[in-house]
């Protein structure tokens, strides 16, 4: 497993696509910090990159890499190594590579310009989202053998969590605004890793008051230490659960 992980990391870090992704993050981060006088506003701008661009690149790159290395996986399956270890090694290599690139592209500028708790939360949220969407990418890739369908499913998952889910939540809130929705709002936020990361950042920036009723509910629950542990626990679950499911699927899959 560790040898596979090491090989994957070495292979990915030479990828021109990943180098371009890292340079893009560095350029965006340094540009925003250089042009903005207020670091808090710059963090808000970077939050959009972390919540939208980072999950998109993570899930698309991971899916593409998995299918491109499928013949390599088929070769290793014939060796005396368990399929579960093979898949976990592949996942660890891809995930660690993308995390390293994110930490260089976003983490270094944040450490230089915003070395505070808000900056740390931005980096931690981005790292969690990177791992989450790599997990979802592997789930989509193992679920279907066809590369086009796998990439399509990955893009559909990203579109659902990044854009469509918020629209569905708004429709639910407007449709049932005459009913007490405190617990429902928390439950709906728990079902989306991007929303969880956004809430953690908003709580750190203390701008929940600008969000009205929803912000008050978030502040009351997620603003507490219990809410923080709850959010981190759910994000960890979003990372681990898809990997466990796809590892079991891969172990039984007919290659």
Model-found features: residue ranges?
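Selective transmembrane-helix segments that form parts of the transport pathway or gating/packing helices
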Residues: 83-119
């Amino acid at each position: 497993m560790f040898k596979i992980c090491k090989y994957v990391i070495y292979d990915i870090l030479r990828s021109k696509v990943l180098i371009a992704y890292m340079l893009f993050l560095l350029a965006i981060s340094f540009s925003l910090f250089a042009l903005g006088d207020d670091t808090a506003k710059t963090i808000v701008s970077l939050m959009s990159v972390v919540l939208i661009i980072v999950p998109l690149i993570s899930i698309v790159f991971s899916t593409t890499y998995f299918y491109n290395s499928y013949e390599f996986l088929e070769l290793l399956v014939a060796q005396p190594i368990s399929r579960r270890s093979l898949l976990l090694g592949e996942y660890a290599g891809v995930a660690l590579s993308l995390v390293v690139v994110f930490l260089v592209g976003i983490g270094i500028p944040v450490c230089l310009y915003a070395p505070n708790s808000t900056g740390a939360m931005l980096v931690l949220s981005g790292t969690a989202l990177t791992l989450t969407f790599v997990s979802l990418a592997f789930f989509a890739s193992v679920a279907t053998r066809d590369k086009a369908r796998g990439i399509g499913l990955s893009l559909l998952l990203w579109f659902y969590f990044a854009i469509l889910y918020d629209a569905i939540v708004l429709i639910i809130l407007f449709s049932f605004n005459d009913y007490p929705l405190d617990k429902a709002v928390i439950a709906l936020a728990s079902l989306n890793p991007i929303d969880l990361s956004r809430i953690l950042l908003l709580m750190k920036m203390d701008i929940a008051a600008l969000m009205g009723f929803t912000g008050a509910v978030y502040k009351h629950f997620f603003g507490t230490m219990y809410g923080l542990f709850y959010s981190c626990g759910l994000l960890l679950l979003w990372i681990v659960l898809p990997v466990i499911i796809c590892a079991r699927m891969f172990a039984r899959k007919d290659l």
